[in-house]
């Protein structure tokens, strides 16, 4: 089984996501469509690792927006997100390949992290990288050092990226 551990803020929404009502939980339809295309290509299951899982309103909103979750990582408030992912994996030995998509690096150093910028959300380049990784075409993840993030943001702005 293939699994994507998904953060939502900064991945399925970004600084450019329209939110005229200033709702606390919002998904950008363009970014969600890109994510759904990734899921269709890979057949991966989605485990929510986002802070949205702590709040019933967040979980409701994820379902309302159509985020296709099968499970959530355990709530370990004194532990980094890395430990929550590893605890979930320990309970699910049938996972052969997984990726973490998160705009932050919460001690995810030794996990396959694909890290979009919160300014752009999930880009097509990162979605392709995740798909290639889950399909075993590469072992390269896409974590971003600060300078890489700056360059990604410049590139996205030059392309007039709209989410």
What residue spans do the PLM features occupy?
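Substrate-recognition element of Asp-dependent hydrolases with the DxDx(T/V) motif
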Residues: 39-59
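Short His-Asn-centered micro-motif
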Residues: 6, 49-52, 101-103
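Hydrophobic beta-strand segments of well-ordered beta-sheets in folded domains
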Residues: 2-4, 44-47, 97-99, 113
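Active-site neighborhood of HAD-like aspartate-dependent phosphohydrolases
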Residues: 1-41, 45
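Generic structural signal for well-ordered secondary structure
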Residues: 28, 51-53, 78
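Short, active-site-adjacent cap segments at secondary-structure transitions
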Residues: 12-13, 54-56, 106-108
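C-terminal cap/substrate-recognition subdomain and adjoining C-terminal extension
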Residues: 59-163
